[in-house]
UniProtKB/Swiss-Prot annotation:
Name listed for the protein in its UniProt record: Undecaprenyl-diphosphatase
Gene Ontology biological process terms, A to Z: cell wall organization; peptidoglycan biosynthetic process; peptidoglycan metabolic process; regulation of cell shape; response to antibiotic
Family to which this protein belongs: Belongs to the UppP family.
Catalysed reaction, written as an equation: di-trans,octa-cis-undecaprenyl diphosphate + H2O = di-trans,octa-cis-undecaprenyl phosphate + phosphate + H(+)
């Protein structure tokens, strides 16, 4: 039976997951710290994290549902064109961006899972922060892609290559893809939108594989806890995505980079 403390843990971790999954700050680093502080670790904790990630993914689907359905040929009215060219974001862009990480992720799955330790995550937090700073300082002054529909196939594939950095736990998938997009000439806002849309198939695939391998850790008694975490992550992620997309029109990623360095210092202080 699930006790009240377990539900409290589920709520807190759901908030952390929802807040950090799509921000360039690394949800993995935060989940490790908070999980350790709450005494929630081990195989069941890892399974729980996979399930609440699905709640965050659902939030992206809700925000971008019209665009996502349009990519697979199901249209619910016209999708507003975003950009200055006559191009259109297609399923081909998403598939191209998925290829590099899918290949490396499947080839090195066990190696990647072995990197889920505090020391490795700490270094990834720092490296991801450096990439965010590099993206802000080295990005083209006049991005070629000012909207989502301006992104070329070449840019999509390049963003997919940057996404491979996120296979290093703690690096941040959104941080890697948004930074990569900016460096190859995509507007910060458009790069963020593309990152969120790309997250749906990538995270469903990765989470589905992890869940399949850890189903034996689930029991009927865990369902209330997992439901609380899932619903909390969904609601918080929904708010976080909309707030983030509004915020990045006005600020750079420098504050996020600084925050990552602070989190890395906390990981060092807690675990080293």
């Amino acid at each position: 039976m699930t006790d009240m403390y377990s539900l409290f843990v589920a709520f807190i971790l759901g908030v952390v997951e929802g807040l950090t999954e799509f921000l360039p700050v690394s949800s993995t680093g935060h989940m490790i710290i908070v999980g350790e502080l709450l005494g929630f670790t081990g195989d069941k904790a890892k399974t729980f994290e996979v399930i609440i990630q699905l709640g965050s993914i659902l939030a992206v689907v809700v925000v971008f549902w019209r665009r996502l359905f349009g990519l697979i040929g199901i249209h619910f009215g016209a999708v507003p064109h975003e950009g200055k060219t006559n191009g259109h974001l297609t399923l081909g862009h998403i598939l191209l961006a998925m290829i590099p990480a899918v290949i490396l992720g499947l080839a090195f799955h066990d190696v990647i899972k072995a990197l889920f330790d505090p020391k490795s995550v700490m270094y990834a937090l720092v490296a991801g922060g450096v990439l965010l700073l590099a993206a802000e300082w080295l990005k083209p002054k006049n991005p070629k892609a000012v909207g989502l529909d301006d992104i070329t196939y070449r840019q999509a594939f390049a963003i997919g290559c940057f996404q491979c950095l996120a296979l290093w736990p703690g690096f941040s998938r959104s941080g890697a893809t948004i930074s990569g997009g900016m460096l190859v000439g995509v507007n910060r806002y458009a790069a963020s939108e593309f990152s969120f849309i790309l997250a749906v198939p990538m995270m469903i695939g990765a989470s589905g594989l992890d869940l399949y391998k850890s189903l034996h850790f689930l029991t009927l008694g865990d369902l209330p806890m997992f439901a609380v975490g899932f619903i909390t992550a969904f609601i918080v992620a929904l708010i976080a995505i909309k707030t983030f997309l509004s915020l990045i029109k006005r600020i750079s990623f420098v504050p996020f980079a600084i925050y990552r360095f602070i989190v890395a210092a906390v990981v060092y202080w807690v675990f080293m």
